Amino acid sequence: MYRIVATASALIAAARAQQVCSLNTETKPALTWSKCTSSGCSDVKGSVVIDANWRWTHQTSGSTNCYTGNKWDTSICTDGKTCAEKCCLDGADYSGTYGITSSGNQLSLGFVTNGPYSKNIGSRTYLMENENTYQMFQLLGNEFTFDVDVSGIGCGLNGAPHFVSMDEDGGKAKYSGNKAGAKYGTGYCDAQCPRDVKFINGVANSEGWKPSDSDVNAGVGNLGTCCPEMDIWEANSISTAFTPHPCTKLTQHSCTGDSCGGTYSSDRYGGTCDADGCDFNAYRQGNKTFYGPGSNFNIDTTKKMTVVTQFHKGSNGRLSEITRLYVQNGKVIANSESKIAGNPGSSLTSDFCSKQKSVFGDIDDFSKKGGWNGMSDALSAPMVLVMSLWHDHHSNMLWLDSTYPTDSTKVGSQRGSCATTSGKPSDLERDVPNSKVSFSNIKFGPIGSTYKSDGTTPNPPASSSTTGSSTPTNPPAGSVDQWGQCGGQNYSGPTTCKSPFTCKKINDFYSQCQ
């Protein structure tokens, strides 16, 4: 992933500070999600908070901006520490300013929102456990499931639920200069070690700040903020990918200048994190009819779909495989098989990642930054759920949905059917401002607990459930209908398919009646 996220603009410029002010009321959108066990799922009442980078930042003594457009006010922010002391984050109008709405278990993110004081571009949000802490997820041995509607986001846009190893309180306890914490969306980090984050480790990133040439709201400072990242879903209606990114350090940590590596530095591989990751993109793996708009694709992106991502443990208790399933129109659909010679498979494994780097001729920074073992450690630890919608000032999202590099003819360079001239941020803001993405019906629990083999939702248990051991939900006794599960490791249900269907092995963990 090559993430540079768009931010808000104009009179109330988005910026991240560490103090708190209350000129605007902060009312977070409620969002219900489900925690599952083998006996069913129960609702959890949560909420979402917008990242502090989008918020109005002004002097604690009044309403004078500390950051306007893509520049700091150097008369206030003479250095990073002083800036954090003098500037505050304020409350957010989620729907009116940022185009963020929720209803029950659905969260919708709008692309361009013309608010009362500003024009906002995209957003980044986090799931909250309570008013002051993020909801934490330990993915290893479990599965994460959600419904998504990508019909409203095309070439150049990315609706992206992903997990990162942020601090539960947004760094408030760790860094004395951070008085805002998770309540105001502080503490972001990812495997790009982003340097556009305006406050890092409780100080302003104002020193060495260079305003962007193309983004009127953003820039790059001396500091970056790094941590492992699991991209569950980076997607639009044309392409999708899921990608683990390990780091040599398991928790949030800062970096300086080009030693950060990633998108924001001249030495992409000079940091502590794997900026490229090991991705599974069906189009890049040679299947150009698996995912896309229309009934001729296995997954029709004009319709809502359920996305299931499973993090399997091996016999040694470590990460062995990351698998993907889809549910659409009541059918469970196995992930696409790679058609690339020398790089077979339909899931991510250590072997798949090694072969992919070799066959595609990519730099294997994945292995250098911890590889499969490093990712196992990250997925064993608590991570924060991020849900965002963004466009890309660095490479126009071509790495996701087009040919990238644009002049390349080598295997692996084709990632989607979008034109190499597509995805320019200014074009998107002008031509498709009403684009939006919706995420709903989020479920988390042991493998097999968040969906049924017939595509239906598990029944709720009699009482509240908590995350337990990895035990699949057993389907009813008898023979299995078409598209139902009929085998796999730890599966104890029926293995006979109804006539005329037969049980076909998809991978070690899943067989399906076809």
UniProtKB/Swiss-Prot annotation:
Signal peptide start-end: 1-17
Protein family per UniProt: Belongs to the glycosyl hydrolase 7 (cellulase C) family.
GO cellular component: extracellular region
Residues that carry a glycan: N287, N490
GO molecular function terms attached to this record: cellulose 1,4-beta-cellobiosidase activity; cellulose binding
Enzyme Commission identifier(s): 3.2.1.91
Region (Disordered): 408-433, 448-485
Biased composition (Low complexity): 462-479
Biased composition (Polar residues): 408-424
Coiled coil: none
PANTHER family membership: 1,4-BETA-D-GLUCAN CELLOBIOHYDROLASE B (PTHR33753), GLYCOSIDE HYDROLASE FAMILY 7 PROTEIN (PTHR33753:SF2)
InterPro entries assigned to the protein according to its UniProt record, in alphabetical order: CBD_sf, Cellulose-bd_dom_fun, ConA-like_dom_sf, Glyco_hydro_7, Glyco_hydro_7_sf
Segments of this protein annotated with the region Linker: 440-482
SUPFAM superfamilies reported for this sequence: Cellulose-binding domain (SSF57180), Concanavalin A-like lectins/glucanases (SSF49899)
Any GO BP: cellulose catabolic process
Keyword line: Carbohydrate metabolism, Cellulose degradation, Disulfide bond, Glycoprotein, Glycosidase, Hydrolase, Polysaccharide degradation, Signal
Disulphide linkage map: C486-C503, C497-C513
Protein name, per record: Putative exoglucanase type C
Organism: Fusarium oxysporum
Catalytic activity: Hydrolysis of (1->4)-beta-D-glucosidic linkages in cellulose and cellotetraose, releasing cellobiose from the non-reducing ends of the chains
Record-annotated active site: E229, E234
One Pfam family cited in the UniProt record for this chain: CBM_1
Span of domain CBM1: 478-514
CDD domains cross-referenced by the UniProt entry: GH7_CBH_EG (cd07999)
Region (Catalytic): 18-439
Source domain of life: Eukaryota
Enzyme class: hydrolase
Lineage: Eukaryota, Fungi, Dikarya, Ascomycota, Pezizomycotina
